[in-house]
């Protein structure tokens, strides 16, 4: 087991990431603590795929304690669960669960020691994760004491689970969905619980554990935070978690209550935490959730948070869930933990479905753990459904956690986080090779204690499911390369999986929790192209260069001295004596401007004979306005000779209407001869008036008609006659 521990420590190199993942996923509580080898399931169905059983093959304090934890049974669970019964409104932090070292914290102590050594930030991460999970959960935070109690009861719950190994196996195997991950995760939970139990029972045990406990206190704080996260969201999945069906928790809680009646505290725990199924569910989810996601998403994925919730809600709930798992596990464990079942995430989903089909309880538990797995898959691409490739975090996690198997669920996540997911089979194979090289360090067996055969068994089981291009190791072969691949050190299958995850699987497995840090040799995934580039070309005979005529700059020109040698530049002086220099040329150098023989002669022009134009030089002396120039204006007298027209200048003096000029108007009087068209019996004789100053202009002398009327005598008639004549005249008569 020491070797797995060492490998875990090696993983601790990634511990920062790993711790973060654990805190987020509750892996610190379960994964790290679960990583201690799980005692072989009572039902005898050890997870061939989970390295937990392999790790368990070597008895460890945790292994020994795990049965004890199981034996503690409901009574011990109840006793251990006093803290477990934490008001839902109280968070793990409020309960102080994170402060007091939990069994899970102790179990996580392996990781904690490594963390303490180089991963103190991880504790901060755990706290941060805790807070984050709590805030994410939105559920009331439990006091630190309560959290510890809750997390510890989780350890107690694992004890109950240990009682009913079927449940523990079920937990190990995880939700059937995540046969590889879920199994590892469930096993990891059990182992975590066992580790917690071992820590509780033997906190004073090996100094490594004792020393781990202080360091674990921080991881426990992380665990507590996980618990707090779990507690904070008893019914709510964490951020990354996939929401479970509304009736899912009720079903799981019913199953958990049915199985929990064994322990006095189980009933209350279940009552207080119907999310207990979530606890188991969370554990499985952790197992199934790739560490990459944990590391990448510093926040706890919904599944890890749920596991933490389950833990926080109370170990009693965890116990109930585990008890339910114990009852239900027989069906589920085979489904999740069957060595023959492929570890591929998709197979895990199938396993989850199969486990649900197998038993109503299994279905519930599968829902409890499997929904978390489902949640994890939805949030985490590393889940089996997401990645069947060996690079997937699950396969990487499982192979790397033969010793980690106790923590299969948790370690797979870490492993997946550690393991970069490279899809190329060549890369995976290269990683396998690197893992073989690193087997002593970390990849061969994240936990040195875990036998390669055990790892090979779990790996072989999981690898087929993963459909990893790397060769599947037979159960007994225990190929370290696969473990390395799975561990995720360089396994290309797990995309985005930090190398730290692979370490995590190795850490949780050793029950001794030795803080030995195995130098983690991280072999970057070797791509086929890289190997090709390394290939050396066959030696080719050197061409005969003696007969080859070289180009410029070739060997023939090596002796050539550029710019020197025979080439001579002769400067000949030109005889310029006969050359006439231009102005400013060399001949004129001696010329002193403005001096010497050169003279500019200004000859005045004789202008005496020139007659200047007006304004020219000759007129300079002219004074305008003076002299002989005279302007004469002569007026022409046209009046004498010209007769002006009417209105002309001559008629200016004419006064209209005056003078001797008269205007005569002649009036035509045709009416005198005119007759009316219609003879109305009266002849109107109209006489043009005689213009005279005495008489009216118009005078009717007589009117010839019957009974002629004298117009003069009757002025009215005369007026009437005038009017009639005027009207007729207008009409043109």
Curated annotation (Swiss-Prot):
Residues that bear Phosphothreonine: 58, 60, 100, 445, 461, 467-468, 473, 497, 504, 509, 523, 695, 719
Region listing for Disordered, in residue ranges: 1-548, 690-709
PTM-bearing positions, type N6-methyllysine: 551
Gene Ontology biological process terms, A to Z: adult walking behavior; axo-dendritic transport; axon extension; axonogenesis; DNA damage response; intracellular transport; microtubule cytoskeleton organization; mitochondrion transport along microtubule
Glycosylation sites: 692
Cross-link (Glycyl lysine isopeptide (Lys-Gly) (interchain with G-Cter in ubiquitin)): 33, 546, 551, 559, 573, 590, 603, 609, 613, 623, 635, 639, 645, 661, 667, 677
Residues annotated with N-acetylalanine modification: 2
Keywords: Acetylation, Cell membrane, Cell projection, Cytoplasm, Cytoskeleton, Disulfide bond, Glycoprotein, Isopeptide bond, Membrane, Methylation, Microtubule, Phosphoprotein, Repeat, Secreted, Ubl conjugation
Predominant cellular place of this UniProt entry's protein: cytoplasm
Ranges of Low complexity composition bias in the record: 479-506
Residue positions where Phosphotyrosine is found in the record: 18, 489, 686
Disulfide-bonded cysteines: 583-614
Organism, as annotated: Mus musculus
GO CC annotation: axon; axoneme; cell body; cytoplasm; cytosol; dendrite; extracellular region; glial cell projection
Subcellular location: Cytoplasm, Cytosol; Cell membrane; Cytoplasm, Cytoskeleton; Cell projection, Axon
Modified residues (N6-acetyllysine): 455, 517, 551, 573, 582, 590, 603, 609, 613, 623, 635, 639, 661, 677
Function (record text): Promotes microtubule assembly and stability, and might be involved in the establishment and maintenance of neuronal polarity. The C-terminus binds axonal microtubules while the N-terminus binds neural plasma membrane components, suggesting that tau functions as a linker protein between both. Axonal polarity is predetermined by tau localization (in the neuronal cell) in the domain of the cell body defined by the centrosome. The short isoforms allow plasticity of the cytoskeleton whereas the longer isoforms may preferentially play a role in its stabilization.
Record carries keyword Chloroplast: no
Assembly notes: Interacts with MARK1, MARK2, MARK3 and MARK4. Interacts with SQSTM1 when polyubiquitinated. Interacts with PSMC2 through SQSTM1. Interacts with FKBP4. Binds to CSNK1D. Interacts with SGK1. Interacts with EPM2A; the interaction dephosphorylates MAPT at Ser-369. Interacts with PIN1. Interacts with LRRK2. Interacts with LRP1, leading to endocytosis; this interaction is reduced in the presence of LRPAP1/RAP.
Protein name: Microtubule-associated protein tau
Membrane-related topology note: Peripheral membrane protein
Residue stretches of each Tau/MAP repeat: 536-566, 567-597, 598-628, 629-660
Basic and acidic residues bias locations: 1-16, 157-172, 270-294, 354-366
Listed Pfam families: Tubulin-binding
Modification Phosphoserine, positions: 35, 50, 188, 451, 470, 477, 483, 487, 490-491, 494, 506, 527, 529, 531, 554, 577, 581, 585, 597, 616, 644, 648, 688, 692, 696, 701, 708, 714
């Amino acid at each position: 087991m020491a070797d797995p521990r060492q490998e875990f420590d090696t993983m601790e190199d990634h511990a920062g990431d790993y711790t973060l993942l654990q805190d987020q996923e509750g892996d610190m509580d379960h994964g790290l603590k679960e990583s201690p080898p799980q005692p072989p399931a009572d039902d005898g169905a050890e997870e061939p795929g989970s390295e937990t059983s392999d790790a368990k093959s070597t008895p460890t304090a945790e292994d020994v304690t795990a049965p004890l934890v199981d034996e503690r049974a409901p009574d011990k669970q109840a006793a251990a669960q006093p803290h477990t019964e934490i008001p839902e409104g109280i968070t793990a932090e409020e309960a102080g669960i994170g402060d007091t070292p939990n069994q899970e914290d102790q179990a996580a102590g392996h990781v904690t020691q490594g963390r303490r050594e180089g991963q103190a930030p991880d504790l901060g991460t755990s706290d941060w994760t805790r807070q984050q999970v709590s805030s994410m959960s939105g559920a009331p935070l439990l006091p630190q004491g309560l959290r510890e109690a809750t997390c510890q009861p989780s350890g107690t719950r694992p004890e109950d689970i240990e009682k009913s190994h079927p449940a523990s196996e079920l937990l190990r195997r995880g939700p059937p969905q995540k046969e590889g991950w879920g199994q590892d995760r469930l096993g990891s939970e059990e182992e975590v619980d066992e580790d917690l139990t071992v820590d509780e029972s033997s906190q004073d045990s090996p100094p490594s554990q004792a020393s781990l406990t202080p360091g674990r206190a921080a991881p426990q704080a992380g665990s507590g935070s996980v618990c707090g996260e779990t507690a904070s969201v008893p019914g709510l999945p964490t951020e990354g978690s996939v929401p479970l069906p509304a009736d899912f928790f009720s079903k799981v809680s019913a199953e958990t209550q049915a199985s929990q009646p064994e322990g006095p505290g189980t009933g209350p725990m279940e009552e207080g935490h119907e999310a207990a199924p979530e606890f188991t569910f969370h554990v499985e989810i952790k197992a199934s959730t790739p560490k990459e996601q944990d590391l990448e998403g510093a926040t706890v994925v919904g599944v890890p948070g749920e596991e933490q919730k389950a833990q926080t809600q109370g170990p009693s709930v965890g116990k109930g869930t585990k008890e339910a798992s114990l009852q239900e596990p027989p069906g589920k464990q085979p489904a999740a933990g069957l060595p023959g079942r492929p570890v591929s995430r998709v197979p895990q989903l199938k396993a989850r479905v199969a486990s649900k089909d197998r038993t109503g309880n299994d279905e519930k538990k599968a829902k409890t753990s499997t929904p978390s797995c489902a949640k994890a898959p939805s949030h985490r691409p590393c889940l089996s459904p997401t990645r069947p490739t060996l690079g997937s975090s699950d396969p990487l996690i499982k192979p790397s956690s033969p010793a980690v198997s106790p923590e299969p669920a948790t370690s797979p996540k870490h492993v997946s986080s550690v393991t970069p997911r490279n899809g190329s089979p060549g890369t995976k194979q290269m990683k396998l090779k690197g893992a073989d090289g690193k087997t002593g360090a970390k990849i061969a067996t994240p936990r040195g204690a875990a036998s390669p055969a055990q790892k090979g068994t779990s790996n072989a089981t999981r690898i087929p499911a993963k459909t990893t291009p790397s060769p599947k190791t037979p159960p007994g072969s225990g190929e370290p390369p696969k473990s390395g691949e799975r561990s995720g050190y360089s396994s290309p299958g797990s995309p985005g999986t930090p190398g730290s995850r692979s370490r995590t699987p190795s850490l949780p497995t050793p029950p001794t929790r030795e803080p030995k840090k195995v130098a983690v040799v991280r072999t970057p995934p070797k791509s086929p192209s890289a190997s090709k580039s390394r290939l050396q070309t066959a030696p080719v005979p050197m061409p005969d260069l003696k007969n080859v005529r070289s180009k410029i700059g070739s060997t023939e020109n090596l002796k050539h001295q550029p710019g020197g040698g025979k080439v001579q530049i002769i400067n000949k002086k030109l005889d310029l004596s006969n050359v006439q220099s231009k102005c400013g040329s060399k001949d004129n150098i001696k010329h002193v401007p403005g001096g010497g023989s050169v003279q500019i002669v200004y000859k005045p022009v004789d202008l005496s004979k020139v007659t200047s134009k007006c304004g020219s030089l000759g007129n300079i002396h002219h004074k305008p306005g003076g002299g002989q120039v005279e302007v004469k204006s002569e007026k022409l007298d046209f009046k004498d000779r010209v007769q002006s027209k009417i209105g002309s200048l001559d008629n200016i003096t004419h006064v209209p209407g005056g003078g001797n000029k008269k205007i005569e108007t002649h009036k035509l009087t045709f009416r005198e001869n005119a007759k009316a068209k219609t003879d109305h019996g009266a002849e109107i004789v109209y006489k043009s008036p005689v213009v005279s100053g005495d008489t009216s202009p118009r005078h009717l002398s007589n009117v010839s008609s019957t009974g002629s009327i004298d117009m003069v005598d009757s002025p009215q008639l005369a007026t009437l006659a005038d009017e009639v004549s005027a009207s007729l005249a207008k009409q043109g008569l």
